[in-house]
A protein has these predicted regions:
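Residues that form generic nucleotide/phosphate-binding pockets
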Residues: 31, 35, 98, 120, ...
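Auxiliary Fe-S-binding modules of radical SAM enzymes
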Residues: 159-238
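Conserved strand-turn element in the central/C-terminal portion of the radical SAM core barrel
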Residues: 113-115, 121-124, 137-157, 181-183, ...
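Conserved Radical SAM active-site core
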Residues: 2-107, 111-119, 128-140
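Active-site glycine- and acidic-residue-rich loops that bind
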Residues: 86-89, 153-162
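Residue-level detector of anion-binding/catalytic polar loops
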Residues: 78, 144, 174
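Conserved aromatic-histidine-acidic binding/catalytic patches
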Residues: 20, 57-60, 80, 123, ...
Length: 238
């Protein structure tokens, strides 16, 4: 995940610290309420959340996402949700209420239907089949549902995109997005170790395909390009 590097700004590592040391802003709901009370705020949609999973296991204890959604609902603040976990179903009642006011949409991240690959790429996340059930249940409850496919990795999971989109649409998803893998900062070294450990027979091929999609590098920081790549490989994924 490109977001791993954010942990380094807090003095932690992008490796195990990202997975094990969770930073909690316990007064998030109070801060959001204060922000929304600003008369100059124009109710531009906000996102939960681009750099973490707002329904990660810690949410069961802290309920920050629930409290933030309650504030958004109170102020009729439009919000989008991105998650890899079925924990979002806990808040179905609230999301259904927000859906009636057309102020919420949710994206479920699906990267593969290959369970072995999913466990290696995203341990402790919900299975693809469970995610499809989440899409179906929430869409039937009036929540606008979509999917995020990311990261798409050439030579590993990019060939599944059409199948994922079809399955998601069959379960009620109405929009889709994707991100092409980018190995920024420390993630370059973490991914390299993971790739060659788990896929020694074709790791070189995957690595070179990524390089071909980022102008000979494995990362591109240019806005508008970094998340989609460029060149023939990236175009085939798109």
């Amino acid at each position: 995940c490109y977001a791993r590097n954010v942990h380094e700004y807090w003095g932690y590592s992008a490796g195990l610290d990202f997975e094990q040391k969770i930073i909690v802003k316990k007064n998030a709901a109070q801060l959001l309420r204060k922000f929304l009370l600003n008369p100059k705020w124009d109710a531009t949609p906000i996102m939960l959340s681009g750099n973490t999973d707002c329904y990660q296991p810690a949410e069961k204890k802290f309920r920050l996402t629930r409290s933030l959604l309650e504030v958004c609902n109170e102020f009729n603040q439009p919000v989008g949700i991105l998650t890899k976990n079925s924990g979002i179903l806990r808040d179905k009642d609230l999301l259904q209420e927000m859906g009636k006011k057309n102020i919420v949409s949710a994206m479920v991240s699906i990267t593969s239907f290959n369970e072995e690959l999913r466990r290696m790429m995203e341990p402790r996340t919900t299975t693809a089949k469970q995610k499809l059930k989440v899409i179906e249940e929430l869409s039937k409850s009036g929540v606008r549902m979509g999917i995020m496919m990311g990261p798409m990795i050439p030579g590993l999971n990019e060939h599944e995109m059409q199948r994922i989109m079809k399955a998601a649409a069959d379960h009620g998803a109405t929009f889709t997005a994707y991100t092409f893998i980018r190995l920024n900062g420390a993630i370059k070294f973490l991914f390299h170790d993971w790739l060659y450990k788990n896929f020694p027979n074709h790791a070189d091929k995957v690595w070179h395909l990524i390089e071909q999609s980022h102008d000979g590098k494995v990362n591109d920081s240019r806005w508008g390009v970094r998340m989609r790549g460029e060149g023939s490989i990236a175009q085939m994924v798109a």
